[in-house]
């Protein structure tokens, strides 16, 4: 089920690791299929070792349709984003060192983008959500709250 998309997700995860946007098993990728199913990367698995059968297919309520691995610990937040933002079809959760550091600055709610190429790619300044514990739905709640019309945070 969804073999080609699973391959693309794994390849994207390998690229995230190569460019140090994630490390070890941190971060996750998920995609909403046109038919409504959600594909989620498994928890605790390095992308370079991942194969299609490791991916989890679930519905918006978190019921597993296909897959035997444990889904990402951020699944509650991911599903909240997909439910709250029907226009979003992919969630890429990285652990970029600089972005993580910026997110820890108290009171900072937006990252001012001042490099033209980055501004074009980001569509302007980038909203920042408050820190939330790993596996908490709070990340999803905050993402939906601060990004009603933004695609990147």
Tell what function each PLM region has.
Residues 1-153:
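Glycine-rich flexible loops
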């Amino acid at each position: 089920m969804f073999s080609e998309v699973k391959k693309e997700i794994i390849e994207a995860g390998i690229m995230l690791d190569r460019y140090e946007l994630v490390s070890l098993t941190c971060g996750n990728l998920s995609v909403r299929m046109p038919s409504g199913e959600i594909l989620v990367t498994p928890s605790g698995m390095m992308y370079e070792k991942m194969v299609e059968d490791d991916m989890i297919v679930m519905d918006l309520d978190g019921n597993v349709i296909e897959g035997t691995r444990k889904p990402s610990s951020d699944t509650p937040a991911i599903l909240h984003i997909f439910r709250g933002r029907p226009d979003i079809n992919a969630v890429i959760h990285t652990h970029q060192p600089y972005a993580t550091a910026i997110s820890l600055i108290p009171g900072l709610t937006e990252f001012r983008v001042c490099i033209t190429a980055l501004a074009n790619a980001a569509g302007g300044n980038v909203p920042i959500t408050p820190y939330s514990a790993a596996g908490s739905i709070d990340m999803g709640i905050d993402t939906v709250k601060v990004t009603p019309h933004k695609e990147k945070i």
